[in-house]
Amino acid sequence: MNYNKKTVADVAVTGKKVLLRCDFNVPQDKRTGEITSDKRIVAALPTIRYLLDNGAAVIACSHLGKPEPVFDKWVKKQTEKGKDPAELTEAAWKKSLAKLTMAPVAERLAELLGREVLFAHDVVGEDASAKAAALQPGQILLLENTRFERGETKNDPDFARKLASLAELYVSDAFGAVHRAHASTAGVADYLPAVSGFLIEKELQVMGGALANPKRPLVAILGGSKVSSKIGVINNLLEIADTIIIGGGMAYTFCAAQGGKIGDSLLESEWMDYANQMLQKAADKGVKLLLPVDTVIADRFAPDADTAVVEAGKIPDGWQGLDIGPRTVEQYCAAVADAGTVIWNGPMGVFEFDKFAAGTKAVAEALSKTDAITIVGGGDSAAAVEQLGYADKMTHISTGGGASLEFLEGKELPGVACLLDK
């Protein structure tokens, strides 16, 4: 896939209405609706400011949350109260989704920009159409949650066309959503010239560069609970990496595949053959595939569980592995110290419990001290690095969880493929 895409800096924007897809899917307090982290809004500011400073009229849009489960829960409650589900119409759909409105995002964006952010109470309805039509250069309008329109997640051409009709140019800056072929991330590019914003440009340059032309040795650290979620990543990185480090719950499937005893540890037995195939492929290609040599075990899955450290493959019945052990930490950190490029995706243990966070903390610290190019995938790894205060020591922390994972798999990303090539 070609990652050399045109950016907002490559096209004329002055006097144009620009549809800007951002990733404003921010975490909120469940009770008050208050935004608990504005990191994703801040990440979009460079592109927004560039467009406004260069005389564009910006029509920003994003999704927020998952409306369908919220609606289903609401319908269930109404049904329990004696309402007929058939009577819960489109108006009811919108009423049930009030908590997923983009209004708080508009308020926070206005504070960060230091200027007014107009807000449309729909996506392609009368309010959005009127406000978009009246929008002047240097002004910004935020549309309501794109997922309030059922055609969004279906990539419905009719909805995509209506959304595109509000503007003259499409700019995609929502890396966290480019792995989804939705109307606002891919479909609109069928009706408008489409380029990337600065956030996506950086993601493509840094992550694409690490895969296409890495400073070697290239070390990939893969954690998380399941082998099944990392199949494509391991397979793709075996073609590129010099060393692959396995941690987290998925290490126990590899261990069991080699005949080790893993007690009550997480096991995906259906993936044991695959694990052995990957070990053989690594050997055939001369890639070092490092597995834990010791593990921190617990008598139950709880933050206050009794713990012990045992050799890998020798976990007694009734116990489960929840973190990599100290000798493994030493080996993994040594590999990081010698690396030219490090890509990290997934924690080494149950990071949420202090007793089983040492492995993840040690890897994060090792990345903070190395001279290598360090790239942290989104999700739990990024959260760990930020929580530990090492974020500013990393070369790049990806803004996309699922998107960065699919990038590492070598998959085509619909929200990138639809952009104009340079």
Outline where the language-model segments fall.
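Active-site loop-to-helix "anion-binding N-cap" substructures in soluble metabolic enzymes
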Residues: 1-422
